[in-house]
Regions:
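Bacterial N-terminal signal peptides
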Residues: 7-16
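Positively charged n-region of N-terminal signal peptides that target proteins for export
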Residues: 1-4
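Short amphipathic alpha-helical "recognition" segments used for binding
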Residues: 6-7, 101
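Noncatalytic, solvent-exposed loop/strand surfaces
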Residues: 20-414
Length: 414
């Protein structure tokens, strides 16, 4: 326990060293989909507190990232996978075409689903086409790799796993039937540092995963948490060796239990959504080998999320279910602090919720953002229509909210 407290203190110091306004990866700097401090807007009204709107070139679903005064995202442009940069005043700074686009199949998918990730020096982007690219902050390509050599993309839908950064490497997970890999690349050169196969026998589609890995610490060592193929595993970031694994998520061997929503970490517990939104479990981190029987703290079959990933804020886990129910649970016990719901609608929630200060922002696929104050329970504040479909997650930055729609990028102030 003392070792985990020390690790958490080190992580906190590292995060505080980052620019306060940075959102350097899909779910933010600590992969929780939240920022605890600040006062964020109670409404996202196009006629009242919209600061600017910038036109996007085509349909892309990646959540933008922010570093200081720059916004970075991916999108198709004239049939090409493209990385774009905007300033915080909405001006398009540059756009860099990377290679031929591989179009999305799902109505809420695209060839540009994964988010860019940055260490403040370089940008890294991955596309459904299999192209992995590193650029500088001026949009110049530093290196580029084609990952199609690691096997056919057998996912039924559109690749959505975002790359992440460890202290030394760029980490990519490819999780599909028959050719699943965990890969580490040198951040500077793009050379493969290590690669580990991650193939297991499962019922149909249960080895498909769209989840993004999480960087954690295992007994003082940097580790990568991977969720897919009915297994949660922790691997050394140094060489990919597996520290521990938890199984038993699908004892009845049901078909099509694909992983879409990602795991989150809260209070040294991994919160794992599974069973197509019907199950959720809490697993204590640590141990060695198979920890299935020793580290599972709780399991619930009355809550969960299928496509959206949970958020963690204020020591609690916030679950946005596909039909708009919102559950706030204790990560150590799995018990609900409260269970509420946004107003019902025919559309579902595909984007993940974001907690900024005391506000929870929930993007619905039809382009409506719903907001609740969760400081003390759940107080519904309103719903705000962007006028276009939204799949990306809201991004909080400097007490403003950045929204990426299918056609436009929006920034709202207080």
């Amino acid at each position: 326990m003392k070792k985990y407290l020390l690790i958490n203190l080190v992580l906190l110091l590292l995060f505080n060293c980052l620019h306060a306004d940075n959102w350097p990866a899909w779910r933010g700097e600590n992969a929780t989909g939240s920022t605890d401090s600040g006062t964020y807007p109670s409404e996202l009204n196009l006629n009242k507190n919209l600061l600017w709107k910038a036109v996007l070139p085509d349909k892309g679903c990646s959540t933008p990232i922010v570093w200081e005064n720059s916004i970075f995202l991916t999108s198709p442009l004239n049939g090409k996978d493209t990385v774009l940069s905007f300033s915080m005043d909405g001006e398009r700074k540059w756009q860099t075409p990377i290679g031929p686009e591989r179009k999305g199949k799902h109505r809420n998918g695209s060839g540009s689903n994964p988010s860019v990730v940055t260490n403040g020096k370089s940008l890294y982007a991955l596309f459904k086409s299999g192209i992995l690219v590193c650029l500088n902050f001026s949009g110049k390509i530093i290196w580029q790799k084609d990952l199609s050599g690691y096997g056919k993309d057998t996912l039924y839908w559109d690749f959505g796993t975002s790359p992440i950064l460890s202290s030394k490497h760029l980490i990519v997970a490819l999780m599909r039937k028959g050719n699943s890999w965990l890969l580490a690349f040198d951040q500077t050169t793009g050379e493969v540092v290590w690669k580990k196969e991650r193939n297991f026998q499962t019922p149909p589609e249960c080895d498909h995963s769209y989840a993004t890995p999480t960087l954690i610490n295992h007994d003082g060592r940097e580790a990568i948490l991977v969720w897919g193929a009915e297994r949660l595993s922790a691997h050394s970031s140094k060489d990919g060796e597996m520290f521990w694994v938890s199984t038993g998520f699908n004892p009845k061997q049901k078909k099509n239990w694909v992983v879409v929503g990602s795991q989150v970490v809260a209070a040294d517990v991994v919160i794992v959504p599974y069973g197509r939104g019907t199950h959720m479990t809490g697993i204590r981190m640590g141990g060695t080998g198979d920890i299935t029987e020793t580290h599972r703290l709780w399991t619930r079959t009355d809550t969960g999320c299928f496509v959206p990933s949970p958020s963690v804020a204020h020591g609690r886990v916030y679950i946005l279910r596909d039909r708009g129910e919102v559950h706030c649970i204790d990560p150590k016990t799995g018990r609900s602090h409260w269970e509420e719901a946004f107003p019902r609608a025919s559309s579902s929630y595909y984007g993940s919720p974001t907690v900024a200060g005391s506000k929870l922002y929930a993007p619905r696929e039809d382009g409506v953002i719903l907001i609740a104050d969760v400081a003390e329970g759940f107080t519904f504040l309103g719903e705000f229509d962007m006028g276009e479909r939204i799949i990306a997650s809201p991004v909080p930055v400097n007490e403003k909210i950045l929204i990426r729609g299918e056609e436009n990028l929006f920034l709202f102030g207080g």
